[in-house]
């Protein structure tokens, strides 16, 4: 059985999110995007392996689906705690950019919820033993769309704003 829990000492993105408190200052981390991309790759790898075993023991496969959903939830939490505050600070003075960021963030929330809902639908299909392949395809598409959108829009925006703000602080 897969274990998705990582040590905080491992430096993984999930460890960073687990150690945050209300008093933790959120700062730009140039390595965070790479960590998140690595975590997304691991999630995709695990889901692809799971998809090849859909005809196996439904209880085990369902547990693996739940583990994938938990990993996606932790990735989403990391993004919400570490990426979005940096981006929000970067667009705070520009009302148009702020509105576009809110729209982008709502869109990403919708994609994440859709992916999680597809994982739930796959778990239900496994329990019922019907339409498992279709549910797995839908979950794979939702997961892929969420990742592609993050890598195309959120992560570059975080890097751009974080590097720009880091440069401004060095000049000052």
Regions found by a protein language model. Give the residues of each.
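Small-residue-biased structural context
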Residues: 1-172
């Amino acid at each position: 059985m897969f274990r998705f829990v990582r040590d905080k000492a491992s430096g993984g993105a999930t460890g960073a999110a687990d150690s945050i408190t209300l008093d933790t200052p959120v700062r730009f981390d140039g390595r965070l995007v790479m960590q998140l991309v690595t975590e997304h790759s691991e999630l995709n790898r695990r889901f692809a392996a799971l998809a090849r075993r859909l005809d196996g023991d439904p209880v085990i496969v369902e547990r693996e689906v739940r583990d994938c959903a938990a990993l996606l939830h932790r990735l989403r939490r990391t993004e919400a705690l570490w990426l979005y505050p940096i981006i929000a600070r970067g667009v705070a003075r520009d009302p148009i950019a702020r509105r576009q960021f809110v729209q982008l963030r709502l869109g990403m929330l919708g994609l994440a919820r859709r992916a999680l809902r597809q994982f739930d639908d796959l778990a239900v299909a496994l329990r019922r033993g019907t339409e498992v392949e279709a549910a797995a395809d839908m979950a794979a598409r939702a997961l892929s769309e969420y990742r592609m959108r993050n890598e195309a829009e959120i992560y570059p925006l975080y890097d751009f704003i974080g590097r720009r703000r880091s440069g401004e602080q060095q000049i000052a």
